[in-house]
């Protein structure tokens, strides 16, 4: 059985190494440049969460990944899934509105 590579970075930051920079280095080290993204649509599945909650990916992280993918010729877009339970994310229109409220 082949072993998988595991990539890790800690969450400690310094003035010269913030979390966005660490994420970018991690993605590059994992080999994102070895994938042919030229003119390909690339879905970035993220969790938008309900308005007022804090368990969603902050926009600056998604923006950094989008920038990296565009540099590689990709056509990235963000996506999420509606929920089965009732709430603001149970239909597409309200879901998009709650996403905008979270940034």
Residues covered by each model-derived region:
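N-terminal and secondary-structure boundary signal
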Residues: 1-103
């Amino acid at each position: 059985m082949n072993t998988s590579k595991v990539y890790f970075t800690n969450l400690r930051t310094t003035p010269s190494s913030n979390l966005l920079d660490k994420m970018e280095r991690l993605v590059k080290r994992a080999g994102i440049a070895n994938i042919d993204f030229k003119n390909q649509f690339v879905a970035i599945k993220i969790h938008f969460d309900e308005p007022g909650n804090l368990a969603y990916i902050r926009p600056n992280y998604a923006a950094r990944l989008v920038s990296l993918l565009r540099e590689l010729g990709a056509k990235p877009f963000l996506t999420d899934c509606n929920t089965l339970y009732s709430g603001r994310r149970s239909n597409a229109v309200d879901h998009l509105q709650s996403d905008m409220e979270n940034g």
